[in-house]
């Protein structure tokens, strides 16, 4: 945001910055350092182009002449443009030849800024600009800010290293930038508020400013999208007023579509007209961008599309009906289903579900859409076939609505008997697979196992998806009983089947089981590497598998937390929680729990318990049975109470919850918390020891330790050794305390389990120093190295000054893979630049 002012040491009127301007060195420094003759800032309205150009102008060297020509986006004729340019330069003549000669003969360094170049197609003016930019005077630098990319010979400039370009995405604010602007927000709320503003604005500069002027309603933590009259007014003036009525209508229709391409536009707006409308909107910088980095699909910039969808009447059901017809003709069943729902053609939507499989549940927000359709239309519409019953049942189980799922499963009886005995057995086997998962999630292990095994015995090759689900359920049960060998064998069988069917979604689901196995065995780094790889593969999918990516992010957050990487864990928990909330996944619980644990690590127990209350509130709002969340919620709460010195609260809660997992009607722990029962038991021993209300605490802990050691559960073993140390210290056995501590520390070092040690320190801040171990725990011996072996190779080559291409050639991997490794390195080390990554790695001692 700029205004004009007279500057005595520069020719003419020059811009000045807004009092609210935020200087961003990461954008300015590369622009000023670039030796390219032409700097092009091409981005939609409100992207901060003028402000960035102004900052660069104000930093021009003292021996440099700087000229500022504000064009206001007007569609000027060539003669008028030449006149204005000549006037700015102080030339007496404005004919083209004089301009070209004068610029070519400049003898002093000159920076010429063209701000807000012509917004509408103007081929004649673009050709003149191309001739001006072709002047090869090394003393002349062009700085061009524009919404529309002019039709100039950019490839030639690029090949000659004479072009430096900034696009809209690079101009966006990041969370740190926004935190600096939140001067009216309490510091403790700044990070969360900045994150919410980013989510709603995409970092778009005008959107961020409007959010700040609207008063940031997100400070209260509400996720509701507020209508912004200011944003709509801005769009009217800066976008719609520059377009024809036909283009305005087309843009508003497209804003209501999740994705579109030229062919769909032809269907919607007429043959020969639709593709032209789309091209014009793209050419004029109307916030049209690639849909999730796709080469084939486009979308309207999400924050603006969301604002338009909130406005009633800007697009009718008829447009969605026509879009549904096009997607159906293209056999794009996902797009057709979404458009049928938006058109409120519910019977059509149900008929399209015949083309859906279980894999569709892990795409986008299909679970939410299916559940809404089921609730809105009732059983008559959505339970018309065994396949529909299976889809709705799976969606209900995914969301944690077990009672409704049980009712839904019972509907399978309506489709019996089948015409043949074989079909009857297949239908029964599918029922058993679904019933097995319901029982498994309810904690009824034996009954679930029987159903899984009987279903596997009957399910045919065409029912491979149901077979995979049974194998996954059996894998999780093996993990819950600490039978790691059986779990590994079952998981391998399932992965082989998923790969044979070419199902990357199922492979990702099964790799989550594999990662749990690795975590249980004390190999969090291998688990993280496994999940990072599958995450990368899934992100290349055309339809974003949001629910699966959410679960993977939460598991990676847990792994990062266990290794002492709180910053990375926080990012994973945030992204995973966002995806799980969006897709109605009951696993959103673990996003809240993870955030609570990160807060407790920072001694912010008020925030930690707030996140636990948020978790409980969500579970209750969604009517999820308390067997899903009560045990782990109280276990984490008890961790915090013990750290606060409140063992009585911990003892009461743990005693109560342990009853559910002991006795004749005992339930298994939820599949996402494999070692929940053992953790509850050792925390209860700790609480009772502090209260001096325990008998034989060390014997009880040693029994748990023996079980963990026998089954290779190294992560749990480390926690138990540290718990034995604490209890031995409290009961006056220093020798045992010291030996248990040393055994625990060895596991912490070997398996990178820094969180277990952090929790001991939070419970007993002076214990390590009293036992003489604090001095030995230097950062070099305990600091977690989050990088995989391949990432260390890449970082070492970066430290040697190699380019990405050179690294790819030396390691025999693709350039894309090198860039992916570099992004992961930056994320894990919490840095933005290569030099920062190298410096931090050297400080950690992982790179020489």
Predicted regions and their residues:
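Conserved P-loop NTPase "ATPase switch" module shared by AAA+ and STAND
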Residues: 103-125
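P-loop NTPase Walker A phosphate-binding motif
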Residues: 39-66
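Alpha-solenoid helical repeat architecture
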Residues: 294, 332, 345-350, 384-389, ...
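C-terminal boundary/linker of central alpha/beta nucleotide-binding cores
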Residues: 54, 147-148, 232-310, 318
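A structural signal for repeat-array scaffolds
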Residues: 242, 289-387, 399, 408-411, ...
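Amphipathic alpha-helical "lid/sensor" segments that cap RecA-like P-loop NTPase cores
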Residues: 53, 149, 165, 183-233, ...
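Recognition helix of helix-turn-helix DNA-binding domains
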Residues: 801-836, 840
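Amphipathic alpha-helical segments of tetratricopeptide repeats
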Residues: 337, 357-358, 375-378, 410-420, ...
């Amino acid at each position: 945001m700029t205004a004009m002012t007279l500057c005595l040491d520069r020719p003419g009127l020059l811009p000045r910055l807004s009092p609210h301007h935020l200087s961003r060195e990461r954008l300015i420094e590369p622009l000023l350092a670039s030796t390219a003759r032409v700097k092009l800032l091409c981005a939609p309205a409100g992207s901060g182009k003028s402000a960035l150009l102004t900052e660069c102008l104000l930093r021009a060297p003292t021996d440099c002449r700087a000229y500022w020509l504000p064009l206001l986006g007007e569609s000027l004729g060539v003669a008028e443009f030449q006149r204005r340019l000549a006037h700015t330069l102080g030339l007496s003549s404005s004919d083209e030849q004089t301009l070209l000669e004068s610029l070519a003969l400049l003898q002093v360094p000159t920076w010429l800024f063209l701000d807000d170049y012509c917004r509408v197609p103007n081929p004649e003016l673009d050709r003149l600009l191309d001739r001006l930019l072709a002047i090869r005077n090394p003393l002349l630098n062009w700085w061009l800010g524009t919404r529309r990319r002019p039709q100039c010979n950019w490839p030639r400039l690029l090949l000659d290293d004479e072009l430096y370009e900034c696009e809209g995405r690079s101009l966006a604010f990041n969370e740190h930038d926004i935190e600096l602007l939140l001067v009216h927000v309490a510091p403790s709320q700044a990070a969360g508020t900045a994150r919410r503003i980013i989510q709603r604005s995409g970092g778009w500069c005008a959107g961020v400013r409007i959010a700040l002027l609207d008063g940031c309603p997100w400070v209260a933590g509400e996720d509701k999208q507020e209508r912004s009259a200011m944003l709509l007014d801005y769009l009217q003036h800066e976008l719609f007023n520059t377009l024809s009525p036909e283009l305005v209508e087309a843009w508003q229709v497209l804003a209501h579509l999740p994705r579109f391409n030229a062919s769909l536009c032809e269907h919607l707006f007429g043959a020969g007209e639709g593709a032209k409308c789309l091209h014009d909107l793209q050419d004029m910088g109307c916030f049209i961008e690639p849909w999730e980095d796709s080469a084939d699909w486009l979308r309207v910039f999400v924050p603006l599309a969301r604002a338009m969808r909130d406005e009633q009447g800007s697009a009718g059901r008829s447009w969605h009906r026509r879009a549904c017809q096009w997607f159906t003709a293209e056999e794009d069943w996902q797009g057709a289903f979404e458009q049928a729902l938006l058109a409120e053609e519910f019977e059509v939507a149900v008929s399209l579900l015949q083309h859906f499989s279980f894999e569709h549940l892990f795409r986008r927000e299909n679970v939410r859409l299916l559940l809404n359709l089921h609730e809105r239309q009732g059983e008559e519409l959505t339970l018309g076939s065994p396949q529909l019953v299976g889809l709705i049942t799976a969606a209900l189980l995914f969301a944690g609505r077990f009672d409704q799922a049980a009712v839904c499963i019972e509907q399978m009886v309506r489709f019996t008997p089948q015409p043949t005995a074989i079909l009857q057995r297949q239908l029964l086997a599918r029922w058993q697979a679904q019933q097995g998962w319901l029982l498994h999630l309810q904690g009824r292990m034996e009954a679930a196992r029987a159903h899984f095994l009987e279903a596997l015995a009957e399910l045919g090759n065409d029912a491979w998806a149901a077979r995979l689900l049974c194998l996954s359920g059996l894998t999780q049960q093996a993990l819950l009983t600490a039978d790691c060998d059986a779990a590994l064998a079952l998981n391998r069988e399932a992965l082989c089947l998923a790969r044979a069917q070419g199902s990357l979604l199922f492979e990702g689901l099964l790799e989550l089981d594999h990662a749990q196995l690795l975590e249980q065995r004390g190999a969090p780094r291998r688990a993280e590497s496994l999940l990072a790889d599958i995450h990368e593969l899934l992100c290349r999918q055309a339809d974003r598998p949001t629910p699966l990516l959410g679960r993977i992010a939460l598991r990676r957050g847990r792994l990062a937390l266990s290794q002492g990487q709180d910053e990375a864990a926080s990012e994973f928990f945030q992204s995973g929680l966002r995806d799980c909330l969006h897709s109605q996944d009951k696993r959103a619980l673990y996003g809240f729990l993870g955030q609570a644990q990160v807060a407790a690590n920072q001694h912010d127990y008020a925030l930690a318990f707030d996140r636990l209350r948020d978790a409980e509130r969500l579970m209750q709002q969604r009517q999820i049975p308390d067997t899903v969340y009560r045990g782990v919620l109280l276990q984490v709460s008890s961790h915090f109470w013990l750290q606060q010195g409140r063992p009585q609260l911990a003892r009461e809660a743990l005693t109560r919850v342990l009853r559910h997992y002991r006795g004749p009607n005992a339930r298994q722990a939820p599949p996402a918390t494999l070692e929940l029962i053992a953790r509850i038991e050792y925390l209860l021993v700790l609480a009772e020891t502090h209260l001096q209300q325990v008998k034989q605490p060390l014997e009880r802990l040693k029994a748990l330790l023996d079980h963990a050691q026998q089954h290779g559960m190294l992560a749990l073993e480390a926690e138990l050794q540290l718990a034995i140390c604490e209890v031995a210290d409290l009961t006056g056995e220093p020798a045992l305390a010291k030996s248990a501590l040393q055994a625990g520390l060895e596991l912490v070092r070997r398996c990178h389990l820094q969180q277990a040690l952090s929790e001991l320190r939070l419970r007993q801040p002076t214990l390590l120093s009293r036992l003489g171990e604090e001095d030995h725990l230097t950062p070099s011996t305990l600091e977690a190295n989050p990088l995989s072996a391949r990432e260390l190779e890449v970082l070492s080559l970066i430290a040697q000054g190699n380019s990405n291409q050179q690294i790819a050639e030396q390691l025999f991997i693709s350039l894309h893979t090198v860039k992916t490794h570099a992004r992961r390195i930056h994320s894990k080390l919490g840095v933005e630049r290569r030099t920062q990554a190298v410096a931090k790695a050297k400080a950690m001692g992982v790179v020489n």
